[in-house]
Design a protein with these regions (language model features):
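Conserved beta-strand positions in the central sheet of alpha/beta enzyme cores
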Residues: 39, 68-69, 102, 124, ...
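Active-site-proximal loop/turn and secondary-structure-junction residues that shape catalytic pockets
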Residues: 11-13, 42-44, 73-75, 105-109, ...
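Histidine-acidic metal/acid-base catalytic patches
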Residues: 1-33, 46, 97, 135-150, ...
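N-terminal pre-domain/capping segments
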Residues: 1-80, 87, 94
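Active-site acidic/histidine proton-transfer and metal-coordination neighborhood
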Residues: 59-67, 71-150, 160
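Short, aromatic/basic amphipathic alpha-helical patches
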Residues: 54-60, 113-116, 232-238
């Protein structure tokens, strides 16, 4: 069974998304490129769009795409408290017809309350680029003996936290329910995401350590004069990899 390929709208760049008229304008490109779904980013939605998510849901359905919803916020806020905005984010995900809501972990503490989505929306936690997204923190969270959210394994973010991605894959693969495919190179004192064709083959080896049937999200730069062709190239590459 080949994995679903999801296109993250942010892969086109914030400026390009704005130039095209917002994330809804990307749906024809993503659908024509043969992708299975789209990841909608909350930070790229205007206030007006947040008030009309059902229209976005209709457009996604018209293009026969699945939807994931990414929110640039954490599951836990200070001192291990569940984010008070969680229910709002779940409602937004439901309104746009998303099947999962992706958050970072945040300031989780052992013994903290474990929220699980009660709607038809799956909750997933991603390793982000902060101190809360280190392998030590993520591994501790997913080592709990209780029902847990799924994991979004971001292949590139381990570079930002100074962790070894291969070690992370060996430890966490059985928790992974969504993969963000990303390659990066050094950039000043940090890292910069690059297209897979510009990267070495280490991303292939890492991807092969992760569950082969889980959805793969394109979260590296998609740029060029023909966005459909560029997107299709990577959709096909990741589907066959």
């Amino acid at each position: 069974m080949k994995p679903e390929i999801i296109v993250v709208t942010a892969a086109y760049g914030h400026q390009k998304v704005a130039e095209l008229g917002g994330q809804q304008a990307l749906l024809p490109i993503i659908a024509e490129a043969g992708a299975d779904g789209v990841e909608i980013r909350r930070e790229l939605l205007s206030e007006a769009e947040l008030q009309s998510l059902s229209q976005l849901a209709d457009a996604i359905a018209e293009h026969q795409l699945e939807a994931n919803y990414s929110v640039p916020d954490a599951l836990y806020v200070a001192n291990g408290l569940v984010n008070p905005q969680l229910d709002r984010y779940l409602q937004e995900a439901e309104q746009m017809g998303a099947r999962l809501l992706k958050l970072s972990l945040g300031d989780w503490r052992p013994g903290a309350v474990m929220p699980l989505a009660t709607r038809n929306v799956k909750l997933v936690v991603e390793n982000d680029q902060t101190e809360y997204g280190t392998l030590e923190a993520i591994d501790a969270f997913f080592s709990q003996r209780q029902p847990l959210p799924g994991m979004t394994f971001d292949m590139g973010n381990w570079l930002w936290t100074g962790d070894d991605a291969v070690t992370a894959a060996h430890r966490l693969a059985h928790h992974v329910s969504y993969i963000h495919v990303k390659a990066a190179i050094p950039h000043g004192d940090s890292w910069r995401a690059i297209a897979l064709d510009e990267a070495d083959d280490s991303w292939r080896a890492l991807l092969n350590l992760l569950p082969g049937t889980m959805p793969r999200g394109i979260e590296f730069p998609l740029q060029g004069d023909d966005l459909v062709a560029v997107t299709r190239h990577y959709v096909d590459l990741l589907r066959e990899e």
